[in-house]
Amino acid sequence: MVYSYSEKKRIRKDFGKRPKVLDIPYLLSIQLDSFKKFTDQDPTGERGLEAAFRSVFPIKSFSGNSELQYVSYKLGEPVFDVKECQIRGVTYSAPLRVKLRMVLYDREAAAGTVKDIKEQEVYMGDIPLMTDNGTFVINGTERVIVSQLHRSPGVFFDHDRGKTHSSGKVLYNARIIPYRGSWLDFEFDPKDALFVRIDRRRKLPATIMLRALEYSTQEILDLFFERVEFKIKKDTLVMALVPERLRGETASYDIKDAEGSVLVEAGRRITARHIRQLEKTNTTELEVPVEYIVGKYAAQDYIDPDTGEVLVSANSEISLEDLAKLSLAGIKELSTLYINELDHGAYISDTLRIDSTTNRLEALVEIYRMMRPGEPPTKDAAEALFQNLFFSEERYDLSKVGRMKFNRRLSIPDDEGSGVLSKEDIVAVMKNIIHIRNGFDEVDDIDHLGNRRIRSVGEMAENQFRVGLVRVERAVRERLSLGDLNELMPQDLINAKPISAAVKEFFGSSQLSQFMDQNNPLSEVTHKRRISALGPGGLTRERAGFEVRDVHPTHYGRLCPIETPEGPNIGLINSLASFARTNSYGFLETPYRKVIDGVITDEVEYLSAIEEGRYVIAQANIEIDANGRMAEEQIACRHKGESTFMRAADIQYMDVSPQQIISVAASLIPFLEHDDANRALMGANMQRQAVPTLRSEKPLVGTGIERTLAVDSGVVVVAKRGGFVDYVDASRIVVKVNEDELRPGEAGIDIYNLTKYTRSNQNTCINQRPCCSVGEPVVRGDVLADGPSTDLGDLALGQNMRIAFMPWNGYNFEDSILISERVAQEDRFTTIHIQELSCIARDTKLGSEEITADIPNVGESALSKLDESGIVYIGAEVKGGDILVGKVTPKGETQLTPEEKLLRAIFGEKASDVKDSSLRVPNSVKGTIIDVQVFTRDGVEKDKRAVEIEEMHIAQARKDLGEEFKILEEGVLSRARNLLIGAGFTDAQIAALPRKDVLIQVIDDETKQTELEQLAEQHEELKADFDKKFEIKRRKITQGDDLAPGVLKIVKVYLAVKRTIQPGDKMAGRHGNKGVISKICPIEDMPYDEQGNPVDIVLNPLGVPSRMNIGQVLEVHMGAAAKGIGNKITAMLEEQRELAEVRGYIKQVYELGDEVQQRVDIDSFTDDEVLRLATNLKGGIPIATPAFDGAKEKEIKQMLELAGLPTSGQLKLFDGRTGNEFERQVTVGYMYMLKLNHLVDDKMHARSTGSYSLVTQQPLGGKAQFGGQRFGEMEVWALEAYGAAYTLQEMLTVKSDDVNGRTQMYKNIVDGNHQMQPGMPESFNVLLKEIRSLGINIELDQA
């Protein structure tokens, strides 16, 4: 493998055994691709905005004399960029402008004669845009639209598993689900009649549907039944024989062959042998007794040729009298329906008998009554309703997917077709459900991923947009029909409000539009790759059963079987597997390597769940010989959803990678294969809650996916093009681009601005730090700057801690964690949290609120941190209760006495008519002010601070753009100098020229002169561009803000809080091993090894066996080896050993392992590169052990040997307090520990007095409401058990809801009288009222 300069700084030793066939695809593509399809112009009009417009336009007036046609659309440029939108609290969106054409037809002339055409561009609201990282900024906050897993449109066959009817009979049903429109269900009842339901309303016999589709009784019977033909003889009947139909029946008469010999005697069962004999003798007719036909059903109407009377009607039961009538009328032939109990049921025949309708109109009326009960049906209304239900393109759409699924399920060869249903479609569904009831076909599995599809952002946004357009359509149609159209333009017809409202509602408040989880890069990526079965059109938590939540065989490689929330949403919210993607229909597919005649190729194909069932697929971990053939005879593989063994020759595909089945979060867990699934689930979920630490540290034991994740998450800065680093400071990196990557006519400079100390959605800190230095070569894709939780481009969620597994005085009982004081001293788990506090000045009825430093009844000391505008300084250290922004609110005018009026007149206005409503620091918070933003309404005068901030921003913008210009200008000038040198100028001559004069020199060489002129032009363009950019920036900064109605000014104060680790904080490893810190122990008391090095953390060994997450023990051993190797390299460098020796040792480490694929060629490194690598490996050599393909026990032992550690992984430890050796050796090593976002500071809370609930008068609950501690039923039992009667009494009265008692007690305490008199608790009065409301009067007697 070839490494770039920056990748050589630190290389992960990879223990993966399998070659990499396919890189993990871009992790956010599901979001970005979907939204791109929505906004991009699509000439075919099959998706996105184009499809929405085409489905609604043209809109015709009711009279047909005018119509509004759609021509094209274009999205404008957003006003503010993403960062500006976040600061200002507005939506990052672009205006949508649509070109519409209004066509007026001439009423008098022939139809279709155009009288007038008007074209105009119409504004149709703003469309929120997706940022580069797959998020949306809505009202200043980043949100993610989660993809939804819903039932695919199409037709599904199912049964009720015998739960509906008490007999336990299985009732089959079929359901046609469109993409939009009414659902159509067919179902059997316990008597085997077929019924139909529309939109889950009351059921009707299914034949009503057929009659409404213009089928007669005769046609219905012919569609669903075969016939049995009889010839009527004098005393007997001759039946046309189809031998196959007799199988399994009991002969009720002697069956004779053509010669007249008896084949089957009466009363005997007819077997396959008898049928073969009948076929052999070519028997085509069979004489049967007359009684045989009794009870059969006529296949058609039989009419007396003379009188026209119906003798036997179709589907009626035939009796001997009927037969006599037919004989009399001279009818010689009779057809009956072929029905048998086994596999040709009489379902439709029975249904026709309970169907009360006889013709189409009656059927339509019946359907109308069911859909619109209580409305009087008319012929036209019934006709229109039925037509609109399933046959109108406006109301019903199966969609492309639905049609494909429908046709494939019913074995119709074509995948394309109409979006509405046809008569044939409905008949085919009825035939199929009867086919299933007869036992010829299977029902569908609705949890199969071939029957569930993904709806992503683009599709959902398109649907919402269409909803808005449909609302507009109604209004437009009315306006086209009214008024004088000659005067109107398209702009006057269209009101963009409904469209904006629909889009805004979707992005702002849909269940699937979620506040982005921004704890760390992993939580961002996972949130964007989440697949939810909830949401509009999906399931609900309460109704979802066990089957839907369970792991299905088709999840393999598509949805992760591990990562799902614990709790009520388990199994309903899933995560996309690492390599999965959606196909054009929205079904999930996963990649496989093709296998041809037992040889594994590198050709990769993506298969959906439907296609996968047809093939035999081997796992990724099968043995392969040197020629790429499978080494074993019998191969473990999957076929039709079952795991089985097959011969190598039968294998058609093979997995791409062992990590294929799991999500990115799960594939971050090293030694995942040794962990129990439940704990792996917790591990995957808890990594998302890790808070970025002050100094990120890469995991010593990783899985090799860390870099991919960090880069794809978008938190690191990645080089767009190769070149050399020209300039670096804390907030900017400048790269001089390689000549061969330049676009013609550009300066060849890439400038990367870094994000500094901004607040994330979870109040953690987002900050980027450069990780390259001036002069370094850069290639495209190199990491230039680290973001939160990344270290040299690797994801780094926690810290490597030295761990010992041993009990320690009960401080690690029940998963508690004992940590060393050194961890806190070195700030290993110190995190920065940024809080945003807002102060809003409003216009009230009594006058406007004012932000000022002149606050009534507040001492000087409280105002010491405010400036003259009443806003806190940046850099001020503040604590709970300090004023951040001074604000006064007008009070209601009070009647003044004459004396007060006189005093006022003499001494001027006193501050008695305003009250203090300043923004103060919340009680439990202590921190530093890092930023202040002031937003002022348009037309309101800006205060001094706002002007200062504005000037600062303008100066900063000028400086940034100026530096950018200077860098770009230097790029142009240096190229001009090179030209001049090439044209014969000397360095001295060029140095003597004034800086800008380089561009105006005259050269003899004409081509070079032209090039120089082009550079001069480019320089002018740069200057003009700079002025323009600066002007735009200045205008943005100085313009007033668009604030909510009634708001005059908003001041936002950003407060940085540093949180060190402390008892009560929650920590976890990556294997689901979580715990709470019980004690921070002095370094000298911690257990230490023979060299005197104390451990950092002591964990309880009892946390491992019952949880079955052995991966953590292996991680500790491997971590010990990795760190040990780092220590050895450190020692070598400190002793200044020969570089060859260092190189040899590093090479030995990277070469270790049996069949390791990713070896590193250390020999090709230069001495400098080896030295830099060694320096970066001092802290330990990072290791990758991919999931299901990781390091083996033998390799861990080899690593421990290389590090000079015992291969048992255990050390002698000594007690820090006594110095005595512990009885047994202890497992000591390095584990990657995370600090989770469940901090004790956010949870710790106490209350003295506060707010009470209105009804019960008990204190509220929870920190947010400043509530009390609940003293529940069990706590009452505890006090009862101790007989602590008085304590219990005060708990239930004065400390809870005895209103008079508690106020009296407060007064007593103030007076220094520590007495209490309990009274009646309010909850007792509530109980009395409840009982009285039931009509039982209770009166209390005075005791």
UniProtKB/Swiss-Prot annotation:
Single biological process term from Gene Ontology: DNA-templated transcription
Pfam families registered for this protein in UniProt: RNA_pol_Rpb2_1, RNA_pol_Rpb2_2, RNA_pol_Rpb2_3, RNA_pol_Rpb2_45, RNA_pol_Rpb2_6, RNA_pol_Rpb2_7
GO MF, one annotated term: DNA-directed RNA polymerase activity
Gene3D superfamilies according to UniProt: 2.40.50.100, 2.40.50.150, 3.90.1100.10, DNA-directed RNA polymerase, subunit 2, domain 6, RNA polymerase alpha subunit dimerisation domain, RNA polymerase Rpb2, domain 2
UniProt keyword Transferase, yes or no: yes
GO cellular component, one term: DNA-directed RNA polymerase complex
Key word Transferase present: yes
InterPro entries linked: DNA-dir_RNA_pol_bsu_external_1, DNA-dir_RNA_pol_su2, DNA-dir_RNAP_su2_dom, DNA-dir_RNAP_su2_hyb_sf, RNA_pol_bsu_bac, RNA_pol_bsu_CS, RNA_pol_bsu_protrusion, RNA_pol_Rpb2_2
Major enzyme class: transferase
Enzyme Commission numbers on file: 2.7.7.6
Keyword entries, A-Z: DNA-directed RNA polymerase, Nucleotidyltransferase, Plasmid, Transcription, Transferase
Catalytically driven reaction(s): RNA(n) + a ribonucleoside 5'-triphosphate = RNA(n+1) + diphosphate
NCBIfam families to which the protein is assigned, alphabetical: PRK00405.1, rpoB
Subunit structure, interactors included: The RNAP catalytic core consists of 2 alpha, 1 beta, 1 beta' and 1 omega subunit. When a sigma factor is associated with the core the holoenzyme is formed, which can initiate transcription.
Described function: DNA-dependent RNA polymerase catalyzes the transcription of DNA into RNA using the four ribonucleoside triphosphates as substrates.
Protein family according to the UniProt entry: Belongs to the RNA polymerase beta chain family.
HAMAP family, sorted: RNApol_bact_RpoB (MF_01321)
Name of the molecule in the record: DNA-directed RNA polymerase subunit beta
Gene expressing this chain: rpoB
